């Protein structure tokens, strides 16, 4: 009997309320768009993607962005990647990204992979967050960055695939380090 999937990755969507985390979740898992669903607390959906023909199962957790529902350490426990989302039409949501990064630093595994996502890039005339500034900020933290649109399905798949590939690379690097044992010094003491 063969395995159903090559890897299982838990991803958490984090960011302020109203930035479109739920819309991203529905777009990536069901290829649908909704503006009316309200997340209370936390929920998750499953998505299988294929990398080099191998099935990779994603467990994607959607979190409410309100302070009273803020993600805590139990939500980050065991996660492989965090998608930090801000709204390109809401400067404050971008200014709060460092606070979300601090929560991740505090509660998640130190090796968790992060990506910063600017959602709603289809609203060109309402854009207030400069994408070059956002890219510069992400680069300064060595975190990948993408602008997307959950509504128009722009760059969503690409963002998730890049996160999956980073997770696979991390696993392969870790595995390689474990198999390479340091050279032993042959020392004879008389």
Curated annotation (Swiss-Prot):
Chief localization: membrane
UniProt motif (Effector region) ranges: 37-44
Binding residue positions for GTP: 15-22, 62-66, 119-122
Subcellular localization(s) per the UniProt record: Cell membrane
Gene Ontology molecular function: GTP binding; GTPase activity
Record lipid sites (S-geranylgeranyl cysteine): 187
Pfam families noted in UniProt: Ras
Ribosomal protein keyword on record: no
Source superkingdom: Eukaryota
PTM-bearing positions, type Cysteine methyl ester: 187
Membrane-topology descriptor: Lipid-anchor
Gene Ontology terms: biological process: intracellular protein transport
InterPro entries (UniProt xref): P-loop_NTPase, Small_GTP-bd, Small_GTPase, Small_GTPase_Rab
UniProt KW keywords: Cell membrane, GTP-binding, Lipoprotein, Membrane, Methylation, Nucleotide-binding, Prenylation
Residues that make up the propeptide removed upon maturation: 188-190
Gene3D superfamilies in alphabetical order: P-loop containing nucleotide triphosphate hydrolases
GO CC, alphabetical: endomembrane system; lipid droplet; plasma membrane
Family: Belongs to the small GTPase superfamily. Rab family.
The protein, known as: Ras-related protein RabF1
Phylogenetic lineage: Eukaryota, Amoebozoa, Evosea, Eumycetozoa, Dictyostelia
